[in-house]
Amino acid sequence: MMDLSQRRLRDLALRWFDPVDLPGNFRICTDTTDFFRVDYNDVLILNNHPYLVRGNAKEGRFGIDDEPKYWVKRSTDLLDGSKKVIKLVFNERFQARVGPITFNCIRSPMKEARVLSVVKGHPNFMQGFSVADDSRNVVRIIDYIYGENLPTFISGIKKDHEEYFHGSFPSILRAYIETVKAIHFLHENEETHGDVRRDHIIVDETTTRFRWIDFDFIFYHHENRFGYDICGLGNILIYLVGGGDVIAQRLRDERPDVFQRLTREDMNIIFLNRVANLKKVFPYISDTLNSVLLHFAMGTETFYDDTGQFLDDLLKAKSSLQET
């Protein structure tokens, strides 16, 4: 068994950190049940492997950039210096709605551990593994992905929409299609992502691939267990085609002629202030691509049953971009 004495831990930590950044003695944690007690400069020992905690991860959704996620620890592997994201057990339940449909949701560490095994080696997913702590909590140890999340990446493209759509969007669509194929791979393996949203895609700065993170949610619905993932994919596509959210209130103020042509049926089925029928706003969007978006509009009468159908239409839309 590895020597994990205080002296040995300090020697390991000094390979990666300045002495002034380290405590005189480390507090060692082998039971993560109370994740609030796992704090900065604690050493997590999991499966006889030491990780130095460097802080809590933060929630970046909807601009909440400093909302800590106390069950997710930014850490360093003391044996090789690599950055890790260590996810501790946090249980919660809630309901979500997509139009008239209600989904029941739970957060499941076991499910995420299972999915990590399924996607091992897949370039469009975060990579990691699970271990049990001394109280048999399922802890997930994730390789840190260097890059920015998808909203940050898109907001960094400083072009007007037409220039963005014809210049940047074709390559973005290609990368996005790879993420849809990745979700299709999950579904073929009878798994779901469970929390498909744009800030759960990281643009890997090394490979430029779009990579999925955070798949510890399970959504239940008696008709289609994959439906929530598909709705999330549609919301991301609408966001990418628009080069950001196209908000009705903003159109009312800035483009009143366009706003007056919009109806309730043109709006996003989940976010009722966002336009899904983007061809009414940007007429150069192809009919083929816009027809995909309309599957996620309030006026739709047909939903995608599976990611295979969605992929087929996306590939046709990609071809329509090349033709124009």
Give a label for each model feature.
Residues 55, 59-117:
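ATP-binding glycine-rich loop module of kinase domains
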Residues 183-198, 203:
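Catalytic-loop of the protein kinase fold
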Residues 127-138:
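Short beta-strand micro-motifs within the conserved protein kinase catalytic domain, predominantly
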Residues 175-176:
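Activation segment signature within eukaryotic-like protein kinase domains
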Residues 2-63:
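Juxta-kinase regulatory segment immediately upstream of eukaryotic protein kinase catalytic domains
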Residues 145-160:
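Structural motif in protein kinase domains
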Residues 210-289:
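C-lobe/activation-segment region of protein kinase-like
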Residues 297-309:
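A conserved short helix/loop substructure at the end of the activation segment
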